[in-house]
C-alpha cells in the first residue's frame, strides 16, 4: 500500500487533476482488502500499468511503434503469436516493436532519432507473451473501477509483472524505497 501511495504521489502534481490517480488508489485499496480473490502480484502489476495510463502515459499496445503494423486481435491471435513471443515492448518508445522490426533494425528509433548504439536501444525492450499483451491491453483501456477484473495464470504472469514495473520505474525516472521493501518481504 505504501509503494502504491508513493507512486501515485510521484506522478501527481499540483497543476494536474489528481482525481483519477487517487480514485485508482482507492480501488486498489479495496482490491487489497478483498485480496483472497486476486493475488498480490496481479494487483501490483495492474496498478502500476493503470497508474501510468491515468497519468497520461498510455502505452501503444495496438501495433508496432516502428512500422505501424497492427498486432493480431485479442479475439483471434495468429498461430505464430500463440507459440512464441512475437512482440517486444520498448520502454523508450512506450509501445510495441514487432519481431521483424526488432530483428531487422540495427538501431531502433529512440524518440524519433536513430541510435547508433544498438545495445542501448535493445536493452530497453522486453519480450511479451500473448497473455501478457492481452492483460496489458485490458488494464490500459479498462475503466478505473474494473482495472483488476481479469485473470492471468501465474505461469504467464512474469512478462506482465515485469512490463508494468519496468514501465512505471522508467517513466518515474527513479526507484522507490517502498518497492525495495516490498520485494524484501517475498
Could you tell me what each predicted segment is?
Residues 1-186:
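Non-catalytic alpha-helical scaffolds and adjoining flexible linkers that form interface surfaces
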Amino acid at each position: 500500500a505504501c509503494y502504491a501511495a508513493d507512486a501515485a504521489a510521484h506522478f501527481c502534481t499540483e497543476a494536474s487533476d489528481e482525481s483519477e490517480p487517487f480514485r485508482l488508489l482507492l480501488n486498489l485499496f479495496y482490491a487489497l482488502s478483498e485480496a483472497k480473490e486476486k493475488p498480490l502480484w496481479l494487483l501490483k502489476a495492474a496498478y502500476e500499468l493503470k497508474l501510468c495510463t491515468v497519468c497520461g502515459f498510455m502505452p501503444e499496445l495496438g501495433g508496432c511503434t516502428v512500422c505501424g503494423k497492427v498486432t493480431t486481435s485479442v479475439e483471434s491471435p495468429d498461430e505464430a503469436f500463440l507459440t512464441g513471443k512475437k512482440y517486444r515492448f520498448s520502454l523508450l518508445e512506450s509501445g510495441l516493436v514487432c519481431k521483424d522490426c526488432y530483428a531487422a533494425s540495427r538501431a531502433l528509433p529512440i524518440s524519433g532519432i536513430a541510435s547508433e548504439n544498438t545495445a542501448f536501444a535493445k536493452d530497453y525492450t522486453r519480450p511479451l507473451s500473448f497473455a501478457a499483451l492481452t492483460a496489458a491491453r485490458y488494464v490500459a483501456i479498462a475503466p478505473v473501477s474494473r482495472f483488476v477484473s481479469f485473470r492471468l495464470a501465474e505461469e504467464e504472469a512474469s512478462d506482465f509483472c515485469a512490463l508494468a514495473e519496468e514501465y512505471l520505474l522508467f517513466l518515474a525516472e527513479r526507484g522507490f524505497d517502498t518497492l525495495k521493501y516490498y520485494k524484501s518481504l517475498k
